[in-house]
């Protein structure tokens, strides 16, 4: 009986181990590393390089029909603002607000600040 229980447990573990990994809802790309490096070591990589990486991640997400994570467009807008690209920053903030309505109050405050 004990051998039978052990075999059943091993079979169950084998089947569970072979299960397909759960698909992520978002295409994260290098976004998490970008945010981490921005706050952990500011100035390490130029703003333009960060923008290029995030734009490439965005294109990859679009090509795979996945959504970008919450905060992605807000972060990209922040980088655009730092680079002096105000129009693109506003567009990114508005996109973040449209995609994630729970961020509307925060995005409205940022949009008001960019107008000043």
Task: Show the residue positions of the predicted features.
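C-terminal motif of bacterial Sec signal peptides marking the signal peptidase cleavage site
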Residues: 14-17
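Bacterial signal peptide processing site
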Residues: 19-22
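Residue signature of alpha-solenoid helical repeat architecture, marking inter-repeat boundaries
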Residues: 25-28, 67
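TPR/TPR-like alpha-solenoid helical repeat scaffolds
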Residues: 36, 40, 104-116
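Structural register within alpha-helical repeat arrays
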Residues: 75-76
